[in-house]
Amino acid sequence: MAYSYSEKKRIRKSFGKRPQVLNVPYLLTIQLDSYEKFIQRDSDGQQGLEAAFRSVFPIVSNNGSTELQYVSYELGEPVFDVRECQIRGTTYAAPLRVKLRLVTFDREAAAGTVKDIKEQNVYMGEIPLMTDNGTFVINGTERVIVSQLHRSPGVFFDSDKGKTHSSGKVLYNARIIPYRGSWLDFEFDPKDNLYARIDRRRKLPATIILRALGYTTEEILSMFFDKVNFEIQDNKLLMTLVPERLRGETAAFDIEANGKVYVERGRRITARHIRTLEKDEIKQIEVPVEYIVGKVAAKDYVDLSTGELVCPANMEISMEMLAKLSQAGYKEIEVLFTNDLDHGPYISETLRVDPTYDRLSALVEIYRMMRPGEPPTKEAAEALFDNMFFSADRYDLSAVGRMKFNRSLNLEEGVGSGILSNDDITGVMKKLIEIRNGRGEVDDIDHLGNRRIRSVGEMAENQFRIGLVRVERAVRERLSLGDLDGITPQDLINAKPISAAVKEFFGSSQLSQFMDQNNPLSEVTHKRRISALGPGGLTRERAGFEVRDVHTTHYGRLCPIETPEGPNIGLINSLSVYARTNNYGFLETPFRKVVNGQVTEDIEYLSAIEEGNYVIAQANSNLDENFRFTDTYVTCRGEHGESGLYKPEDIHYMDISTQQVVSVAAALIPFLEHDDANRALMGANMQRQAVPTLRADKPLVGTGMEKPIALDSGVAIVAKRGGIVQRVDASRIVVKVNEDETIPGEAGIDIYNLIKYTRSNQNTCINQIPCVNLGEPVARGEILADGPSTDLGELALGQNIRVAFMPWNGYNFEDSMLVSERVVQEDRFTTIHIQELSCVARDTKLGAEEITADIPNVGESALSKLDESGIVYVGAEVKGGDILVGKVTPKGETQLTPEEKLLRAIFGEKASDVKDSSLRVPNGTSGTVIDVQVFTRDGVEKDKRALEIEEMQLKEAKKDLTEELEILEAGLFTRVRNLLIEGGVSEAELDKVAREKWLEQTLDDEAKQNQLEQLAEQHEELRKEFERKLEIKRNKIIQGDDLAPGVLKVVKVYLAVRRQIQPGDKMAGRHGNKGVISKINPVEDMPYDENGQPVEIVLNPLGVPSRMNIGQILETHLGLAAKGIGDQINAMIKQQQSVAKLREYIQKAYDLGHGSQSVDLSTFTDEEVMRLAENLRKGLPLATPVFDGAHESEIKGLLELGDLPTSGQITLFDGRTGEKFERPVTVGYMYMLKLNHLVDDKMHARSTGSYSLVTQQPLGGKAQFGGQRFGEMEVWALEAYGAAYTLQEMLTVKSDDVNGRTKMYKNIVDGTHQMEPGMPESFNVLLKEIRALGIDMELDEE
């Protein structure tokens, strides 16, 4: 393949055997697309804001005389951009304005005559906007809305699997779940009666629902049963015969016809008997009269002469009844066909327990169940039932629900509306009875065809609709009050409920989460997370094993590896690499179509529902050059996800890629196929906790997923359009755009501003560094600047470290690690952490708090780092306890001592009416102040420091805009110059005149003259735009800040802390191999090889076999080979060997193995080869894709090429004695991460601190400055040693003996070291609790 200029800087050699059919899709699609659909005006109004408005409007007054109609909406421009919102602590949102029309009808005139129309734009609150990276800025912090996996609307058939009843009988049930509205359940009880529940309330016989729908007993029976006809002829009883119905029964009498006995009495009726009966076309047989006894009448029988009801429908027929019927003149009797095998009498039985007799009684019964205690009226009962399932306002199945419903009941897909029909309800009951009769299957609720994804847009729309409905109620009430003469839509609408609903969702919903911003991977993963928790989802406590387990339909949709350990395991999942949601919200994954054993280029996305019908081959099936399967039998997933062997011609689809199964984080683990799943899970989760190091270092052994993740995460800067780098410094990059990519009439300059040293949500440091040089060509979509944890546009979470697997004096016992001092000296794992501390000055009852350097009772030295406004200088190095912002709070009048009275009398001032409430550096933190921001409320005078900061910001803004103008003007004048030269003006003439005068030239060619005039206009426009932008910037900087009520000033101080690695820090590899640093060892004591090169980390080999993560060993070997090749290249450069030799050697490295990648260095210029070699000096980056990685032979080949032992083991010497270790040791390069569990954040000690109110025991935890818990096991330990006094001290004076501890303090101060233990407070608590039970318990103190 052809590489672009910047791709040629460093090419990662890939071992992937299969060419990439489909590029990795944009990883944040699920977030961006979903919200885009919400915000956009949809033409059909099926989703988003438009749909919400259309579903609520028009709002008609109760008397129908006025209505408020919705016309359209528009979103304004946000006031501040994303960056400004973060600094100011506001929400990045756009105002929503809706055009509404108030129509008044003339009530006297004919219906529909309009009397008056008022149209107006109404403000309806603010809608938060999504940033380009799929996040929201809410109150200044970046948040992510996690997608939810919930049960799809539709109908589900399920069983209790025999767990409910003691007999173990399986009870079946059906549940209709709408998108919004009441749930309707049908269920069998152990006696086989069918019951219904509405909204999971108490159950009613299901036939009540049918009666409420208006069906009579006769209609109900005819809907659910087949009939059998009996004829009475000359005292004989003849039965109409349907032979098929007799299958499996035992003949209770001889079955004979036309004198031939077909089945003798007591014999079982078989298929042969049925065939003979059918062949002889027997339509009727004679049966004994007793046979009809116990059968059930299918309809009402009325004595036609008297009109009296002889036998009601659903009545069992007895001999007397038979006599009555024949007396009444009935020659034919219809009964229900039932049997024990597959036609149960369930509905008939249920009708017998049903207390109702007609529609009204059924409606009343339902009303009583839904609204117990209210007196039912006919109207109320009807309205309640109608509103429940048949009103579009209250009930909506949604398109998805209707689709699932129709599929389940085998109806046509597109038919039906969002509400239920009579046929829908009877259809569900029929199917449930079929399942009870043994025909049909119950649904699997964990199947991904029955669970769908609800993304940001949909959830925001639901919240918005809730807000609108609240507004609707208020508007309807207001419209019904009458007196609408001078009223406008603006007066009717109160935007508060809407903005409150939206705000609540974005600010405090369970699915709106504080973005995990440790590193680019954690951001991407967080946005691709799928949670089963949240509103309308599951709860941790109720979720069983089945829901959490991996399901066959997860294949290619949800990752089977990446999920948290702990109570949320399996409830929070991650989207697989290629997965996406379809229009209905179901997850789908791509496959290549296979036709007659030939794999085509066509790619189709299948959802879990569709996938079940096809045979699908795996991505690593063997194909020949014509894309035909080479094996006679291919391993495939067949129907129902079961694996099996199939012939090539039976295959329908083939997987797209080997990494289709896993998520983004799991796809970053090289040799994943050699790791145990549990360890891979830890590896995937721990990569998200890696802290960005000071100098990012790309992994030598990667998987090829590093580039897409770094690009899509949005932390790096990507070129919007191709061009040439015109200027570059640490804070901005200017690109002159290629002619063919510019829009006619623009300057053709792109300016990219870099983010410098800002704080992330996790207090890590975000900083962007340019990685292009002046004059370099860049193409669209290429990387211009690296962000945190990226290296030349590749994700770089850790460092490549030389490791050895060997024990070393117990320092790597139980997963600890021995680290060389060199790692610390070279700052390999040094990280920068930025903390934000803020000081708020409020208006209190006693007066305003003041930020000042004049603090009572504080020495000069403590104020040395503050300026005259009382705010710390930027650049000051501070440690725990130092004052950052001086602040005093007025305190109430206290009783004055005589001395103070004297002072007041002399100096006549209030010397002590304020107390010190300054912002200090928390204990245990130290660092450098890198930034200070002051926010002042409108109308409060700004202090000197605030004015200085303002001035500086104005200068910066002006400088930025001036530079931007200069760059744009330069671009413009280049075009003017070229135009003039083409138009016949000589260069010498142009150079004599000032640039501005060029625009006044006149040219002979009219077209060129027009162009010149256009350019002059553009220049004028540029100037105006500059002035406009400057003015906007100025206003933004100068205007007062919008602070919380009662707040006058906020000062934010940013501290940067540089943390080197130290014992107690947690580190990990990518294979779940985590550990804690036990010791930093001097370089000279570390084991070294024959060349004197020491290893950097010593790991314990015993951590590998039992954990079964062999991937780390293979990574180590391959890392050694990569480094070996880098060393060879380095040596060649140092020896100044010819470019041809370098080219040949590098080409050899790229050609090694059987990968599908081809790199042809002969197309590179010498300069490009040299630059590539320069970038490969530290090692040749390799990619071993998941499930398609390097083979052992390839690793050995690379080791040979790097002139290293193919065993991957090296003889090492002990650094302290110089002796050789007794056997070769596995040495190589492993990619190690430093995790965000730093010992500095966990170390904590307490001397005196706060106590719990009730128990009077010290609080727990570092945040509360708590003590160490002395639990029951610790008590046992002291008891075991008989340390009675120590134990007494622990349980009394060191804990909750209030008097004892004060005395103890006094004794220590007095120098008498004695302890007087008293009564622990927790004993008193126990006393009180016993008294609370009503038992009077006294303590007799002797």
From Swiss-Prot:
Keywords: DNA-directed RNA polymerase, Nucleotidyltransferase, Transcription, Transferase. It catalyses: RNA(n) + a ribonucleoside 5'-triphosphate = RNA(n+1) + diphosphate. Its EC number is 2.7.7.6. GO terms for molecular function: DNA binding; DNA-directed RNA polymerase activity; ribonucleoside binding. The RNAP catalytic core consists of 2 alpha, 1 beta, 1 beta' and 1 omega subunit. When a sigma factor is associated with the core the holoenzyme is formed, which can initiate transcription. DNA-dependent RNA polymerase catalyzes the transcription of DNA into RNA using the four ribonucleoside triphosphates as substrates. Belongs to the RNA polymerase beta chain family. This is DNA-directed RNA polymerase subunit beta.
